[in-house]
Amino acid sequence: MDGALSLLAGKRAVITGGANPRGIGAAVVELFLAQGASVAVLDHAYAEDGPGALVDGRVNLHCDVSRGASCEAALARAVQALGGLDVLVNNAGIVAATRIWDLPEDEFRRMVDVNLTGTYNVTHAALPALLESTRQPAIVNLGSTAALRGGGLLGGSHYAASKGGVISFTKALARELGPRGVRANCVAPGIIETDMTLGKFGENWEQELKQGIPLQRFGSPAEVAQAILFLASDLSSYSTGIVVDVNGGFHIH
């Protein structure tokens, strides 16, 4: 790719949760590759004994983000394959709409383990390589509109709490890592057409929801990926600790 047209030329990126072809992570992977990055995709769906070498600028590695040891091993392989690390996108996550009166402790813990602790685990494992980067290193975390509006729709209190924690964690990272040259920002998607949302509302409710969104539609994974690209690239070189809403105006605050 012509470097003049590429926002991530020469950058090395780790993206978690990219195995589902209809998810946000896959859209980020596709866009980053198109913008000149080399990418390590971490997902629990990949085989633990899979090949660890780049093919067409990409390597797929097994990682259970809820387990620190798995993250340490995956990041070590990713950094070796990429030759370093400049961008981390913590995209892996789960969602459920269980209401508090039906919410068992193990489900609450699982939500936090994947969404919040998983973000910590991967970030902690990636940090040594990010601190060595001389290419304006950046962390982009995935929050949610649910964290800003108090759950609802497909996200219960445990989902909102986990994503609210991600937003607070991101802001703290920005303060701690800014003096060391690492930026940390967050994207908060609204209702995005992925497997997590498609077919979950019913036709009538879906139309009512869209009418309540100023842009009158749900978002696409590609539109979230574009916001992530902005935060990962040097276009946002003086932005850290911010939350970018990608919700069509569904939540304006």
Residue ranges and their predicted role:
Residues 2-4, 212, 229, 240-253:
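Short C-terminal tail/terminal secondary-structure segment
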Residues 4, 52-53, 153-155, 179, ...:
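A glycine/serine/threonine-rich, flexible loop-to-helix segment
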Residues 6-40:
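Canonical Rossmann dinucleotide-binding motif of NAD(H)/NADP(H)-dependent dehydrogenases/reductases
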Residues 123, 162, 170:
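Active-site helix of classical SDR
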Residues 128, 175-179, 237:
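Alpha-helical segment proximal to the catalytic Tyr-Lys
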Residues 144:
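Residue(s) in the substrate-gating loop at a strand-loop-helix junction
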